[in-house]
Amino acid sequence: MGLFQKCSRLSLRSSYMWSVCPQYSIAVTARETPDRALIVHWTQHRDVHNSRRLGANPANPSAAPPRLPFSRVTQEDLSFFRALLPGRTITDPDLLKSSNVDWLKTVQGSSDVLLRPKTTEGVSQILRYCNERNLAVCPQGGNTGLVGGSVPVFDEIILSTSLMNQVFAFDNISGILTCQAGCVLENLSHYLEERDFIMPLDLGAKGSCHIGGNVSTNAGGLRLLRYGSLRGTVLGLEVVLADGHVLNCLATLRKDNTGYDLKQLFIGSEGTLGVITAVSILCPRKPKAVNVAFLGCSSFQQLLETFQCCRGMLGEILSAFEFLDASCMNLLEKHLKLTNPITECPFYIVIETAGSNATHDEEKLHQFLEEVMTSSLVTDGTVATEATKIKALWSLRERVTEALTHEGYTYKYDISLPVEKIYDLVQDMRRHLGGMAKNVVGYGHVGDGNLHLNITSPSKDFDLLAAIEPYVYEWTSQWKGSISAEHGLGLKKRNYIYYSKPSEAVALMGSIKAMLDPKGILNPYKTLPDNIN
């Protein structure tokens, strides 16, 4: 099927709960904007006060804290590492540059040492030594993180998993893959596709990101709607703890109800509790029929109604439902020279179906498209069934992040909200910032309520940042959302955790960290707020 043609925002509640920090949560009633502005002012005041109490920078809670009293690397340390990892202990400043800077070029460390072990035993010996010497360590995979979690803040030793890239086993009956943590996601995808399977995870950064990093950040991605999160598909992990002990929970069983599910501690912990060295993951069969539809809607409300119709009519074959706004499309055309395949619309949708019967799937998709076109929910669209055309349509969603890098400095927010509220945040942020921002754009995963809010300016602008934060977190907390849907907290968001988690939960996280890493050498300054670290 080729190109085909056509044959309100909800208001803020008047009563809501502000939860900057649970100790200061209070129910507030607002009538109109002036009242709301007063409430926001009060909340910001208490947040700044609390940030001081936590030891954070009150002007910028996402800034780096003071360096903790870790030891510094000596020549004796380097001699040990060189003997342990001959030719794989990197100290050349030129070779260290890329590992010291995050993908967005917004966080830069000053590490003088990069270690590249090949085995779990190598990681174990490194951590045992570093723990005894009180040397801080920054685990690093593909370094594609967006919150400053994968690069050193100061002079932490970088422990790279890039050479831990072997597939140990694949069972083509159960679909269970066991591999080292440094395997690149795209390479695993190719490996599985040759065997008629696929990874349950797909990301725009798949050409660089490592499966260990995906697991340590609990990455979501484009297939979560169909296959669920990594907390469900990861069956087992091998993890090296801070003192060098190896925790082998590399199970290949779908059902194991013996005691606590310890692997869940390390999924999403961003390398602060242990270094993931191997993963076993359940992989689905490769679908025999894949279709991608790229559609246009004239309003976000129509987009939501299209999603509702889509879930009802496509059912079990629906594998992705993504969106991007017109501002995103403009950036794709401007910076990456990509072509919009349909007429201009305020909103665009990428729908993917995946099934085992091409005729059945195409019939269901045709019925769905006929319904949304007839009811005027969709104004224009195109459908692809060939691999090259499917890739071209997906690139319009996957390369938005890349296009944004050409706009100057980008403030990125990865928010989880009730689906009907996703785009309200984008619109409210535009009104809130006025002319301060160059661009405010929204895109993301409608299927799981995940908004990627991006705000650009010609260069780093502290006044703009002060206008964005904590407003974006207050807004999210008001609607009981999460300030991190899939990117993690890293360095940038660690002190904002109280917007999404009660103080009791954060305190318990600190207790777990203290138990597993009493010296705090693993990825310090990340994930947990400064009062816990």
From Swiss-Prot:
Protein name from the UniProt record: D-2-hydroxyglutarate dehydrogenase, mitochondrial
Subcellular location: Mitochondrion
MF (Gene Ontology): (R)-2-hydroxyglutarate dehydrogenase activity; FAD binding; zinc ion binding
Coiled coil, from the record: none
Transit peptide: 1-55
Reaction(s) catalysed by this chain's protein: (R)-2-hydroxyglutarate + A = 2-oxoglutarate + AH2; (R)-malate + A = oxaloacetate + AH2
Primary enzyme class: oxidoreductase
